[in-house]
Amino acid sequence: MIDVKSIILIVLDGLGDRPGEILGYRTPLQAAYHPNMNRMASLGMTGLMHPISPGIRSGSDTSHMSLLGYDPRVYYQGRGPFEALGLHMDMKPGDLAFRANFATNRDGKIIDRRAGRINAGNDQLASAISIDIGNYKFRVKSGVEHRAALVVSGPNLSDKISDSDPHSEGKPPEPIRPLDPSADSTAKIMNEYLKRIREILRDHPVNVEREKNGQIPGNELLIRSAGKVPDIPSFQEKNGITGACVVGSPWLKGLCRLLGMAVIDVPGAAGTINSNYTGKIKTAIDASKRYDFVLVNIKATDVAGHDGDYELKRRVIEDIDIAMEPLLGQSDRIVVAITGDHSTPCSVKDHSGDPVPIVFYTDGIYSDDVKLFDEVSAMKGALRITTQDVLNILMEMAGRAEKFGS
C-alpha cells in the first residue's frame, strides 16, 4: 500500500548565483546561514536543475509553466495575459495584453526602467493613460511598485509585434515593429498609443509633484511580452491533482488563475523584498490539508539579484530559512521541494543559464551524501534534471504517479 502525501513546491525566485568577491568568492547561498534548508538537504535528495534545458536563460514565466508540468514550447504565448489576469483585468477572446513598467524618459532616453521603483500615484497614472483611440480601447492597471499591465481591445489585433522596452538604460524606447505582415495595423496603433500617453504622463500632476520633490517621474510606459490568452488545460485536468498557490507577484497569480488553481492571499506577502515569508510557509502547510499540490513563490531573492546586491541576497536567504522551520515536522505527510526558477547572479543583474540547486525532502526516500544546500554542494547530489522533470518526481514521491505501461 502506497502512502499518499501532499506536495509543497517552494520556488525561491532567481535563487542561483555565482561566487562574489564581497562574500569571499562564495555565492549568497553558500555564505548564508540556513540550517533548516541544510537539514533538508542532509536528509533528502539533492542535485542541480536546469530551467527548461541546459544553457537556457529562462524567464520566470516559462520556468514556472515548466515546473507546473506545462511545456512552454507548446503553451507559452507571452507573459502579458498572466500579468493582466493577475490584476483581475477582464480579457475577451482577441484581446491583447502586455507586461508594462512605468519608467523614466529623459531627453528621449530611458534613464531608469523602474522609475525609481515608483510606488505612489501609480493608480492615477494608470487611469490617466486608459484611453480610447478610434475602435481600440486601452486599459492599464498598476501592479507591484513600477509594474503594470496593459490590455488592448479592438479589431484584428496580433501578438506578433516587438517590445517598446529597450531592456537597458541609456537607450530610447523602441518603436513597435510587426514581426509578421498580419501585425502591421497592430504595430501602428500601438505606436500611436505610446506617442499619445507620453504627453499625458509628462504633464500628469503625480509626475510634476515627484519632480518637485527631487524624485524621477514615471513618464514612460515600457511594454513587452504581448500575448493572448492561450488555450491550455487546467492544472487538475493535466496532472490529475488539485492545486493552489501562495504567491505575491500578480503575473504568477494570473498564471495560476488561468490554470484553475486556487490563489490564496497572505497578508503582507507582496512580490517584494519586504514580504511575509513566515505567513507564506504556514499558509502553504495549512493549504496542503485541502489541496494535493501547493506552489509557493518568494520573489525577494530575485529582486536582490537584479539589484546586484550580494549581501542583501544572503540576508534574504537567511530570513527565508527561518520561515522554513515548520516544514521539518511535516515530512510524514508532505513532500517538499525547494529550488529556484532560474539563476539571477548579482554579477549579471539578470537571468542566466546557470542550473539551480534543488532538494526533495520527505520520509521514505533515499538520501545522497550532500549535507549543505547550495550551488556547489548540489553538484555532488543524486540528480541532474530539468524543470520539466520536477512535477513527475514530486508525484512519484507523493505516491500519486500513474504507472506508464502495464
Curated annotation (Swiss-Prot):
Residues 156-183 are annotated as: Disordered. Belongs to the BPG-independent phosphoglycerate mutase family. A-PGAM subfamily. This is 2,3-bisphosphoglycerate-independent phosphoglycerate mutase. Pathway: Carbohydrate degradation; glycolysis; pyruvate from D-glyceraldehyde 3-phosphate: step 3/5. Residues 160-174 have a biased composition (Basic and acidic residues). It is an enzyme of class 5 (isomerase). It comes from the Archaea. Keywords: Glycolysis, Isomerase. The gene is apgM. InterPro entries: Alkaline_phosphatase_core_sf (IPR017850), ApgAM_prokaryotes (IPR023665), Metalloenzyme (IPR006124), Pglycerate_mutase_ApgM (IPR004456). GO terms for biological process: glycolytic process. Catalyzes the interconversion of 2-phosphoglycerate and 3-phosphoglycerate. Pfam families: Metalloenzyme, PhosphMutase. It catalyses: (2R)-2-phosphoglycerate = (2R)-3-phosphoglycerate. Its EC number is 5.4.2.12. The lineage of its organism: Archaea, Methanobacteriati, Thermoplasmatota, Thermoplasmata, Thermoplasmatales. CDD domains: iPGM_like. It comes from Thermoplasma volcanium (strain ATCC 51530 / DSM 4299 / JCM 9571 / NBRC 15438 / GSS1). One of its GO terms (molecular function) is phosphoglycerate mutase activity.
